[in-house]
Amino acid sequence: MGKSSTKPKGATSYRDTAFGIIPRSKLINLEIEGTKRGLEYIENLLSRQKDKKISPDLILGLHKVSFSCILPKWAGKLRVIQVAFSGKEAPAFYQLSELVMNFCRDTEERISHLPNQDKENFVLDVVALLAWFQHKFVFIHPFQDYNGRTARMLTILILLRLGLPPIELRSETESDRRSYLNAMQKGDQGDLSLLEKLISQALTESLENIKNL
C-alpha cells in the first residue's frame, strides 16, 4: 500500500474532490458548509441524548455528514493508506480500528474522572482533557483528511456535554494555523502547554461572551 503525504503547513489536499480540481477559495467555502453540517449533527445528537458518548460510530458519522459532499469516496471511512503529516508518519492504517476504539474508551474514562463543575479546578481539568483529546486524535489520524476539523468539532461536543460553551480555535489565517500547528508539534514532544493555552483562551472568550449577553 502506498504512502501519501498531506501538504505542508496543514493545507488540505483537494485533487480528488467530488467537484474535480477546484480553487482553494471554493474549497474553503465547502469546508465551512461541511463544518456547519457537522455542528448541526452534534446538536441533534445532544438534543436526543445529553450525555452522548464518544464512540467510533459517532466519529465516523460526524466525518461523513461533514465532508461527504467534498470527498464522497472516503468521508466517514477510516483511511486505508499510509500517510505522513507535519513531518511524521501516522500510525499504520491497519491498526486504526483498535486505536480509535481504545481512544474512545480512554476519553470516556478521563471524562468520568473530571471534578464536579463547582470545583475550582474543573475548567483547568477540562482544558487539559481537551488538549490531550485533540492532540491524540490528530496523532491517530483516522481519516485521510479533515482530522483537525473533526477533532475540533468533537471538542465542541464534549464542551456542550459538560455544560460549557463551544469554542473556536481559529485556523483560517496563516498565523492562526502556525500557532495551532506549533502547539500540536509541541504536543508531539510531550508538552501540551501551548495547546492548553490556545484552548483556555478560546474557552475564556466564549465564557466572557456569555456573560456579556
Language-model segments: what does each one mean?
Residues 1-145, 149-213:
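FIC/Doc superfamily catalytic core
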